[in-house]
């Protein structure tokens, strides 16, 4: 009975906190689905122009030719 009461009170607190904070949060936490995520980011394929390694799909930018290798 005590376990059920604790679970019920916890659920009530979570529901209240979610309802109260809805619409008030200015800066939400970043999630793995953001565009800045390496798994979902757009990248330049081999032969395309680049200025840094993180622009290329294979993470290598030739500084001599400014192209992804």
Curated annotation (Swiss-Prot):
Main location: secreted
Cell compartment(s), UniProt: Secreted
UniProt keyword list: Disulfide bond, Knottin, Secreted, Signal, Toxin
Cysteine-cysteine disulfides: 43-57, 50-61, 56-68
GO-annotated molecular function: ion channel inhibitor activity; toxin activity
Keyword GTP-binding: no
Cellular component annotations (GO), alphabetically ordered: extracellular region
Propeptide: 18-41
Entry keyword Metal-binding: no
A Pfam family reported for this protein in Swiss-Prot or TrEMBL: Conotoxin
Signal sequence extent: 1-17
InterPro entries xref list: Conotoxin
Tissue: Expressed by the venom duct.
Note: This precursor corresponds to allele E1c. Has not been merged with other alleles since they may differ due to geographic variation (see strains in PubMed:19606224).
Domains (record comment): The presence of a 'disulfide through disulfide knot' structurally defines this protein as a knottin. The cysteine framework is VI/VII (C-C-CC-C-C).
Family the entry assigns: Belongs to the conotoxin O1 superfamily.
Protein name: Conotoxin Eb6.22
């Amino acid at each position: 009975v005590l376990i059920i009461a604790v679970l019920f009170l916890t659920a009530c607190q979570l529901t209240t906190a979610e309802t109260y904070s809805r619409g008030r949060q200015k800066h939400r936490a970043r999630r793995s689905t953001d565009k800045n995520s390496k798994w979902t980011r757009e990248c330049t394929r081999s032969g395309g122009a680049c200025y840094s390694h993180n622009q290329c799909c294979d993470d290598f930018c030739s500084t001599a030719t400014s192209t992804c290798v």
